[in-house]
Amino acid sequence: MEQLSEEMIVVLDFGGQYNQLITRRIRDLGVYSELHPNTITAEQLKEMKPKGIIFSGGPNSAYAEGAPKCDPAIFDLGVPILGICYGMQLMTQHFGGKVDAAEHREYGKATITVENQSKLFQGLPVEQTVWMSHGDLIVAPPEGFVVDAQNPSCPVAAMSDEARNYYGVQFQPEVRHSQFGDDMLKNFAFAVCGCEGNWSMENFIELEMEKIREQVGDKQVLCALSGGVDSSVVAVLIHKAIGDQLTCMFIDHGLLRKGEADSVMKTFSEGFNMNVIKIDAKDRFLSKLEGVSDPEQKRKIIGNEFIYVFEEEASKLKDMDFLAQGTLYTDIIESGTATAQTIKSHHNVGGLPEDMRFELIEPLNTLFKDEVRKLGTELGIPDEVVWRQPFPGPGLGIRVLGEITEEKLEIVRESDAILREEIKKAGLDREIWQYFTALPNMRSVGVMGDARTYDYTVGIRAVTSIDGMTSDWARIPWDVLEIISTRIVNEVKHVNRVVYDITSKPPATIEWE
């Protein structure tokens, strides 16, 4: 297959939770980037003809037994290498420097002083804020390397061997908290690697359509359509690639938002002229979920049931070989990789039955949410679909904490509709990354009229973010929150209290379950 771009920077995954962000930041510069496991061979890399290689961070100690390594022949390819955190320590070990446990671990913001203006720090200030996350540090750089930056706790915060185009930083430039992190990555891509920045979403569409046609051939594809941004973009992209070889199946599992089922059918069946089959499986899903309160178990049940329903319905259709899903990079990250810890399993990733008979097509699994929106716009999908609020595959099933009942679902459905209506009225719907209501598994005492009540509490979650990997709670004006709270308490039965979640990610995730 033709390579997507003549210039590419490959990121090797050593297990850090933010590794895919590095790939994302490089793409933002107009340079195509892919993430590959640290086990990739030098020969495989050579065939890819990368302009540069980045070694990611990771949770291990470079000197520990069994710590992930890379093919040592990678250092002989003559390709520029940037080591980030663990990646720099690995490079240090390889070239004979010394890595040891830090006396004082550094987690969070720190100030570094630049002592050597290598190409990586070209045009950047001497003092700058970076995001540290390390328990080890470099005690002695390898021969040929110069210390570029330091601080009192980290004598080698950055280093370089410019003769061989090797660079390393002991902080995370890919995280927004690093003040000039984007500039460093830009310097690496352009000043060090010599990239020109000619990659775009149009290139991505061309590549994915080619991949889809090559993978599918003359066979049929069944698309899991939910009406959310991800599955909508997948459906339109695949339909653009193979036309009537695509059949969309929309399962109403009883865990959808208010009015969502009707909206999906109108948008895709009528608006895009796609073949959409609607399946009413509400009773089946709720029956399986009865009495289940553990969030992981709920996710697994919903994920499995989705596939089983698809298989049953697909068996009624002719020759369905492929299943398309809207899995994103963030789904894969949070479900864990070979070297990263699992945060939560995603129904698109961890909930699939082992005996599934479909071959998967996941054209968005290298994209972040904001990239998916850009892709949707590029494909001509209307704004009301592209900017629809993100909705998890398990639906309201993970916004009802604890056991799911019809009553609880109705509370979340109605309160969420009020929240979305008022956020849009206030003109905040494009400013806030994601907003929804959740129902904690708790009741509290209240007074309505002259009577004592003992009813549910509704939680409001609203966050600002760029890519969903990190987020901050949205500063919604108090008067808007007051209107939302008043309406929910007055209009939604069995609710007497509304609370606002002001936790960032991390430490919390965006969804409550």
UniProtKB/Swiss-Prot annotation:
Enzyme class name: ligase
Binding-site positions, ATP: 226-232
EC number: 6.3.5.2
Species per Swiss-Prot/TrEMBL record: Halalkalibacterium halodurans (strain ATCC BAA-125 / DSM 18197 / FERM 7344 / JCM 9153 / C-125) (Bacillus halodurans)
GMPS ATP-PPase domain residues: 199-388
This protein's UniProt keywords: ATP-binding, Glutamine amidotransferase, GMP biosynthesis, Ligase, Nucleotide-binding, Purine biosynthesis
Glutamine amidotransferase type-1 domain span: 8-198
Protein name (database record): Putative GMP synthase [glutamine-hydrolyzing]
Role of this protein: Catalyzes the synthesis of GMP from XMP.
GO molecular function: ATP binding; GMP synthase activity
Catalytic residues in the record: 85 (nucleophile), 174
Pfam families (UniProt xref): GATase (PF00117), GMP_synt_C (PF00958), NAD_synthase (PF02540)
Listed pathway(s): Purine metabolism; GMP biosynthesis; GMP from XMP (L-Gln route): step 1/1
Quaternary structure and partners: Homodimer.
Name of the coding gene: guaA
Recorded GO CC terms: cytosol
Top-level taxon of the source organism: Bacteria
InterPro entries tied to this protein: Class_I_gatase-like, GATASE, GMP_synth_C, GMP_synth_GATase, GMP_synthase, GMPS_ATP_PPase_dom, NAD/GMP_synthase, Rossmann-like_a/b/a_fold
Reactions listed under catalytic activity: XMP + L-glutamine + ATP + H2O = GMP + L-glutamate + AMP + diphosphate + 2 H(+)
